[in-house]
Every structure is written in structure tokens, then in C-alpha cells.
Amino acid sequence: MVMEPKKNQNLPSFLNPSRQNQDNDKKRKQTEVKGFDIVVGEKRKKKENEEEDQEIQILYEKEKKKPNKDRHLKVEGRGRRVRLPPLCAARIYQLTKELGHKSDGETLEWLLQHAEPSILSATVNGIKPTESVVSQPPLTADLMICHSVEEASRTQMEANGLWRNETGQTIGGFDLNYGIGFDFNGVPEIGFGDNQTPGLELRLSQVGVLNPQVFQQMGKEQFRVLHHHSHEDQQQSAEENGS
């Protein structure tokens, strides 16, 4: 049994709530609550979808940041990247266009090939690539060590005053080509000057090991020169005594 609210007779009719009006108010409140729930649910679902999208985006960026596999051939000593000064990089880019190369790597290879003489003069040994990139035949280890030994010998002889400079005078003012007598020409005769004795060459039997025959050959050549001048001295003395 539903109890109806008592109506106040003193109040006007429009202020006294009827049952129909109460039912309408109840339905309207229920609709508002349902509408609020729907709006809240949609917002919550939208937020969840946004969070899922953010997670997917983060995973995609992490996969994108992974280093790509190196598709080039593996070469000993090869780094993934070479940092160049800005001017050098710009010049290499310009040379690549001027020379018609396909990449900057070809230009660098071309520069190394043409700079090989300067590299040899600066480092003696030069560069040693893993594969042949120089069109000319590379120098052997024997020739490289011969070159270094020759330079060391020349430096020592200059310090001792036994090597003539370009003007024809020796270092330190000591000239073996003048003032000795016996018709002795000094340094060039014993193979230390500009005219080397034929056949007297420095050879290497192994890398970094001198051939003992070289010293024997040098001793024989020096003995032959000294014996030749001694024989001429004896002939000159005999002629002076005979006269």
C-alpha cells in the first residue's frame, strides 16, 4: 500500500506535487544517472585506448632505435663510422661529384691510392690493406727494410762527415776527395758516395735478418780497392827510384 503525501489545502494547486509529477521526476533522475554512467564509461574506454596506443608507439620506437645489421663486408680494423672535420667532409663530397664516383668511400680509396708515396715517406712501411686496393704492385717487406736500413746508414755517415751533400762538400767540412794524395778519390771509390760499386747491394735473406754474405762481399770490395791503390803506390815509388 502506497501512502500518498498529504496535500496542503492552503497552498496553490501548482505547488502541490502530484503523483504523476513525482514519477516524471524519478524517471528524469534515473535517465541523468544512466547518461552520466555512459559518459564516464566512454571517457574511461577512450583513456584506455590512448594508453594502449602510447605503449604500441613506445615499442615501435624502441625497435626502430635498434642498430641495423652491417650489410658491408667485414674488414679488419673497419669501424662503423669515421668522424671527419667539416671541411674535409665537404671536400670529399665535392671530389666525389667531380670524379664521378658512386660513393664517398670510392673517393677515399682514390685519395689513399694517390697518397701512397707520401704515406711511404712518412711511415716507411706504408699501409697494409686486407685486400689489394692499389693498382700498382705493393712493395715487399724486404725492400721496405732495405729502405729503412739505407736511411739509417746515411744518417750515421752524415753525422761522421762521410757523406757528401748536393754541393759536393762533405758534412762537417771533412772532404775525402781532396788532399789525401795517392790518386785516391775517397768516398766514391769505396762505394759510399754517389757511384756505388756494381754488385754491392744490400739484400735480405729473411725479413729483418741481414745476409752474412753482404759483409763478406763488402770486405772483399774494400780490400780490392785498397790493394789496387797500394799497387799503384809501389809502381810510382819504383819509377821515382829508377829516375
Swiss-Prot record:
Q: Name one Pfam family in it.
A: TCP
- What is the recorded name of this protein? Transcription factor TCP6
Q: Which GO terms describe its molecular function?
A: DNA binding; DNA-binding transcription factor activity
Alphabetically ordered keywords of this record: Coiled coil, DNA-binding, Nucleus, Transcription, Transcription regulation
Task: Give the coiled coil ranges.
Answer: 42-66
Keyword RNA-binding assigned to the entry: answer is no
Please name the InterPro entries in this protein's record: TF_TCP_subgr, Transcription_factor_TCP
Sorted alphabetically, the Gene Ontology BP terms of this entry are: regulation of DNA-templated transcription
Q: Where in the cell is it found?
A: Nucleus
Subunit structure of this chain's protein: Interacts with SPL.
What spans are recorded as compositionally biased (Polar residues)? 8-21
- Return the PANTHER family for the record: TRANSCRIPTION FACTOR TCP4-RELATED, TRANSCRIPTION FACTOR TCP6
- Which Gene Ontology cellular component terms are annotated? nucleus
Region (Disordered), start-end ranges: 1-55
Enumerate the spans annotated as TCP domain: 68-122
- List compositional bias (Basic and acidic residues) regions by residue number: 22-35
